[in-house]
Amino acid sequence: MARDKETIHSKPTLGQNYPNPFNPSTTIKYELPRSSEVRLSVYDLLGREIAVLVNERREVGGHEVKFDASGLASGVYLYRLKTDDFVQSRKLLLLR
């Protein structure tokens, strides 16, 4: 059984934001199997980085970040989690 747990948590996970669609704020959760340098950023669809939510070393475990999009236009945005050895992106939808 311990082997299964190790396999499940061998790499970071990036959850879907909630609520989604959202207005004006949403929550993003991610989990780290080991401490790591973390950068969690939000991008527009042209690839421009519009917000950096986390840019520091984080410890093992679950983490949660709120994103306030109060100054942004309605539309689809991407958020990306980058660690020492992992990168994943997901879409989020801002509706005004």
Give short role names for the model-derived ranges:
Residues 54-84:
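Short, surface-exposed loop/turn motifs with a glycine/proline- and acidic-biased composition
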Residues 50-51:
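Generic structural signal for well-ordered beta-strand positions
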Residues 1-18, 22-42, 64-67:
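Glycine-centered coil/turn sites that cap beta-strands in beta-rich domains
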Residues 92-96:
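Short beta-strand edge segments in extracellular beta-sheet folds
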Residues 86-90:
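Extracellular and select intracellular beta-sandwich modules with Ser/Thr-enriched
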